[in-house]
Every structure is written in C-alpha cells, then in structure tokens.
C-alpha cells in the first residue's frame, strides 16, 4: 500500500471511530435523562395528602382510607389495614422512575398488561391516590413485571398513565395487592 492510501485508510478509520463515540455518548445522555424522571414528580412531597387509595383490576377492588391517623379497608367495614404495607406502596409509587418508553400502539398494550382495566380479559391494575377532598393526586395503570431489568434496583414494571397513550418501563419495586389478606393489620 502506498503512503497516500495508508493515510486515507487511517483517516477514515478515525472518522468512523469518532462518529461511533459521539453517537453512543448522545444515546446514553438521552437514556439517563429519561431514567432520572420520576413517574410522579411531586408525589413524594404530597404523600401526607393521600387520604384514599383505590386499587382495582377487572374483577376485584380494594379501597383504603385514612381515618384518625389509621388506614382502614373501607370496603371491608373499616377493618384496620397494615400501616407498613400502605406506607410501602405509597413510597414505592413515589420512587418509580421512567426507564424507557415502550409503545404507544393500543394493540400492544395488553402484552405489557397496561390496557384499560375495564377491557375484556384485561390483566392490568389501576391505582388511584386521592386527597381528603377526593381530588386525584396520582393515577397509574400498573402492568406486568419486567424480567431481568438492569438498574439500581434490578426491578421494574410496565406502567401507563390512564390519560396517556404511551406505556413505559418503570424502574422500582412496586407490589400492588388485590388480596385483602395482604392488607390486614396482623395485630
């Protein structure tokens, strides 16, 4: 190879390498920005305002209310609920972070279990947090758990806000129970 051909080869190689580095760094910045966004930006500051929790799927529902500093199952004769389980749920919801946009196509939402709860064969769960005046603080459709997710917690769920079309992979460990026994205070 001549000196000129060799020089052109190395310049092209250098340009391709620089282009690849720039492309990768731009992509990682976008992913970082999204992953830093919380699903509900101000929820952590408003947790004390939550007075009602409603959880439902196509077949079951759990309703909780805060009465005299205790959480009760309003649909179960105001039976006292486990403070630990309620606080765990509220904290988990407030810490959920958007990791990656998944789909906006309505026909794909059932695969992630984030379709409308009222639809036939729906496997999604609707979580609604309300204040003392019955005003919605946060509302989220919670889908299936993500498998083998990388990240700080290694845990994730597919989620979608009911008024939005886009389903997201959210980072965080959120367990939503529709079994009354999981909510009962063991005392």
Report each predicted region and the residues it spans.
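Soluble, acidic/polar mature domains that operate outside membranes
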Residues: 1-187
């Amino acid at each position: 190879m001549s000196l000129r051909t060799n020089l052109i080869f190395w310049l092209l190689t250098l340009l391709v390498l620089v282009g690849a580095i720039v492309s990768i760094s731009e992509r990682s910045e976008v992913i970082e920005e999204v992953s830093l966004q919380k699903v509900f930006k101000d929820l952590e500051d408003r947790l004390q305002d939550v007075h009602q929790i409603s959880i439902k799927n196509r077949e079951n529902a759990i309703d909780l209310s805060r009465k005299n500093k205790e959480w009760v199952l309003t649909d179960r004769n105001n039976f006292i609920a486990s403070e630990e389980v309620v606080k765990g749920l509220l904290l988990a919801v407030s810490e959920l972070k958007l990791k990656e946009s998944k789909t906006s196509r309505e026909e794909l939402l059932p695969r992630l279990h984030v379709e409308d709860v009222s639809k036939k064969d729906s496997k999604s769960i609707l979580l609604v947090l309300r204040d003392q005046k019955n005003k919605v603080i946060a509302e989220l459709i919670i889908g299936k758990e993500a498998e083998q997710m990388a990240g700080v917690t290694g845990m994730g769920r597919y989620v979608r806000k009911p008024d939005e079309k886009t389903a997201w992979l959210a980072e965080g460990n959120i367990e939503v129970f529709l079994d009354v026994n999981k909510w009962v205070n063991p005392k």
